[in-house]
Amino acid sequence: MTKKYLKVDVVSPLGSVFKGEADMVSLRGSAGEMGIAYGHTELLSTLPAGVVNVRKDQHTDVLYVSGGIVEVTPTRVTIMVDDMERAENLNQAEAEKARVRAKEVLKNPDASKLDIEAANKRLKEADARLKALNSSNGLYYSKDD
C-alpha cells in the first residue's frame, strides 16, 4: 500500500513561504494541540504565535509562526500567517532579549494600555520563537522562570 501524504502550504502576505508533504502536522489551534494526518476531518482554526511541526517519515521541519489561520482538508493543510521562520534560522539571543524587553514594559506601572498590549504580543512571540528553537534541538522550553 502506498503511503499517502498531506500537502502542506504556509503562506504569508508575501506568498508561499513553505511547501511540502507530511505524514503528520502538529500545531496549537484555538481548541488546543492538534495532530493532523492524511484523511483528517475538515476544519478551520485560528493559531496563536507558536510552533508548527511538519513531519515526513523520519524528518521534521520545525517552524515558528506568528499566528494566523489553519485550514485543514483530508488531503491538505494550509496555514495563513503574518510571519514564519524555520527554527534553524531563529536567533536565540535575539528572542531572549525580546522577551526581557517585553517583561520590562509589563513591569512598568506607567506603561500605557497600548504599550502593555504590544508587550504581551511581543512576549508571546518571543516565547514561541524560543519554543521552536528548543523543539528543533530536542529540548523542552518552559516560559515560566
From Swiss-Prot:
SUPFAM superfamilies: Epsilon subunit of F1F0-ATP synthase N-terminal domain. The keyword Chaperone does not apply. It is a peripheral membrane protein. Its main location: membrane. InterPro entries: ATP_synth_F1_dsu/esu, ATP_synth_F1_dsu/esu_N, ATPsynth_dsu/esu_N. GO terms for cellular component: plasma membrane; proton-transporting ATP synthase complex. Keywords: ATP synthesis, Cell inner membrane, Cell membrane, CF(1), Hydrogen ion transport, Ion transport, Membrane, Transport. One of its GO terms (molecular function) is proton-transporting ATP synthase activity, rotational mechanism. It is found in: Cell inner membrane. Signal peptide: none annotated. It comes from the Bacteria. F-type ATPases have 2 components, CF(1) - the catalytic core - and CF(0) - the membrane proton channel. CF(1) has five subunits: alpha(3), beta(3), gamma(1), delta(1), epsilon(1). CF(0) has three main subunits: a, b and c. Belongs to the ATPase epsilon chain family. PANTHER family: ATP SYNTHASE DELTA/EPSILON CHAIN, ATP SYNTHASE EPSILON CHAIN, CHLOROPLASTIC. Produces ATP from ADP in the presence of a proton gradient across the membrane. This is ATP synthase epsilon chain. It comes from Francisella tularensis subsp. mediasiatica (strain FSC147).
